[in-house]
Amino acid sequence: MREYIQNKWNEKGFKDLTPIQEATKELIQNGEDVVAVSPTGTGKTLAYLLPLLEKIEINHELQAIILVPSQELAQQIGEVIREWKLPELTMLVLAGGANVKRQIENLKKKPELVVGTPGRLTELANQRKLKLHQVQTLVLDEADYLLAQEHLEQTRSFIKKCPSQRQMICFSATKNEILESIHQWINMTPKWVENEKKMAGNENVKHVYIESPVRKKDELLRKFANMKEYQALVFVNSLANAGILAEKLQYHNIPCALLTSQENQIKRKSAIQAFKKGEVPILLTTDVAARGLDIEDLPVVIHYDLPENKEVYTHRSGRTGRMGKDGLVISFVTEKEVRDLKKLIPADATLEAFQVHSSQLQVAQKKKMVEKKPYKPKEKKGTAKKAYPSKDKKSFKTKKSSGKKK
């Protein structure tokens, strides 16, 4: 590694590379096309990022682009890059939802590295504001999603604007037909790297379900939140359901944050920060908005609505138990959905029925399934910060807030 990367590695207390990092490092350094498949939480971002940073020269020419499916993932990867890059290297995040005029102005800084979403990057390239002629490496993070039928044309459209002689790197948590036939959609001859065996830590993710009629699911979530023990990332299947559920929680004075593709970038960033800082116990989200979302030491993921397929279940559940940490995945299901759930969980995982009360979660603790400290809202002076801005201007209150509902 370059000396500055090695120093950062040592500062963070890292020792060995993870299997996916070890398997892809030389391939990426040598300029090979790569398709890498590895479970969530196995260090995929650093697997492509560190060798990429070693290759980039400080010459004010755009040499590498990282394509991602969402604003949140773009910002998240941007934060990681800022931690690891040389101070002289210029990196920009160019994602949809942000001010395009400001992005155009920032491009005058002549970045060597860009992270962005296909739609916004295509827009900037069409305006001739984003110069692609010197691009040597193109990374697709969450490649299975970027190449899914509903996003394929937009992704391909941008790739075609890049030089034909360039390195292609694709990373994904799941392998599907799209990735297997990637050479049909993109001009590349990849080396395949598959790390299907989970890291030991992933085995510490416990999968449980709570049986409930649909009409009582919101009551279950309120019970969980009122225990005031753990934060949870809660997945629903639609924007409408997310908004309705947020309003119900608000009505019962339960603080939460809402992360959907309908919110602008400022509100979405605010929701994530409120959750990360422990200001709210619940972050409600949809699959699109939370794709690749990385929240350190997240103890619990809740499938409020059961996902449609195994890939989505894997991506959702992968938000907890990352990098060898412990986690708990809870699914709210009807009696008929129990059979469907059994088809979604990992083949080597066990599934248990649970009730929502602290004693059962304590059982999970004894088995070292959830190690994060119990959720304790941060004490604020006066009125608590609005976590979910609703139309009637009501605001949530944290546990120890002295303010009253307006």
Predicted regions and their residues:
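Arginine-glycine-biased low-complexity disordered regions
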Residues: Y4, P39, P163-S164, E229, ...
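Conserved interdomain hinge at the start of the Helicase C-terminal
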Residues: E203-K248
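Post-DEXD/H (motif II) to motif III coupling segment of the RecA-like Helicase ATP-binding lobe
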Residues: E123, K131-K198
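Conserved pre-motif I regulatory segment
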Residues: M1-V37
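Walker A/P-loop NTP-binding motif
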Residues: E22-V34, K44-N59, V80-W84
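Conserved nucleic-acid-binding Ia/Ib motif block in the N-terminal RecA-like helicase ATPase lobe
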Residues: R2-N7, E61-N126, Q134-T137, Y251-L259
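Conserved helicase ATPase core of P-loop NTP-dependent helicases/translocases
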Residues: K101-N106, A242-Q250, I254-A290
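Walker B catalytic acidic pair
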Residues: P118, D141-A143, Y304
